[in-house]
Regions:
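Glycine-centered short loops/turns at secondary-structure junctions
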Residues: 121-122, 199
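Asp-based, Mg2+/Mn2+-dependent phosphohydrolase catalytic module
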Residues: 1-9, 22, 88, 112, ...
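Short alpha-helical linear motifs
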Residues: 66-72, 112-120, 209
Length: 229
């Protein structure tokens, strides 16, 4: 259980509130049509979804740049699909993906309802490893930006979750003591272990079906937050 009183809630964005997989798939579907690329979307996603997580982990750990992340994840997928796509096309596609991703606004089930519920009793914030220009548009376009008092992203912080410095920046921006806040996110490593390391409480939204870990309470649906807050 969580220790009360809690005054502030810190949310991750992608895979926690904003339906990344669905919005990403819709973006690629649109771009393959626009670029006249004959790519089977389902086959593409079978490769892309797990590879994207691998490349994001490398980016989070500082082993690759965001430019390399954006390019290499597509290049690797097309190579595995044995599709001949030029470097120029990959670069165009990569840039167009970033530009168009935030135009899709699907949220995860019960997201809006739980934000409205929590907004009545808590101050809410975002801590995200996503790119600043994209994450800002996601929040605005999906109609949830007004719920959050502060937004801290890795571009502005100069470090990525689970680095303690990004959490300290968020805690300072919120003006609270760590034990008064709870982090809710999908990544056990980046969100949960990172938050716990600086004294924040945590709720793990286990959308990736990680094994039982005992680090903190686990929820499988955003609606279950009501059991704790």
């Amino acid at each position: 259980m969580l220790k009360k009183p809690i005054t502030d809630i810190f949310f991750d964005l992608d895979h926690t509130l904003w339906d990344f997989e669905r919005n990403s798939a819709l973006t690629y579907q649109q771009l393959f049509q626009d670029f006249d690329l004959e790519v089977d979307l389902d086959h593409f996603l079978e490769h892309y979804v797990p590879l994207n997580l691998i490349f994001w982990k490398a980016f989070r750990e500082g082993r690759i740049s965001k430019e390399k992340l954006r390019y290499e994840r597509l290049k690797t997928v097309f190579e595995r699909m044995e599709l001949r796509v030029s470097d120029r096309q990959i670069n165009y596609l990569s840039e167009a993906y970033i530009e168009n991703l935030s135009s899709h606004t699907h949220l995860l089930p019960n997201c809006m309802e739980i934000l409205e519920y929590l907004h009545k009793g808590y101050k809410m914030h975002i801590i995200t490893n996503g790119f600043e220009e994209v994450q800002t548009r996601k929040l605005l376009n999906s109609g949830i930006a007004h719920f959050f008092r502060t937004v801290v992203n890795s571009d502005r912080a100069g470090v990525k979750k689970p680095d303690p410095r990004i959490f300290h920046m968020a805690i300072e921006a919120a003006g609270i003591q760590p034990q008064s806040g709870v982090m809710i996110g999908d990544s056990l490593e980046a969100d949960i272990q990172g938050a716990r390391a600086v004294g924040l409480q945590a709720l793990h939204f286990n959308v990736h079906k990680d094994p039982d870990h005992g680090v903190c309470p686990v929820i499988l649906d955003l609606e279950q937050i009501k059991q704790y807050l």
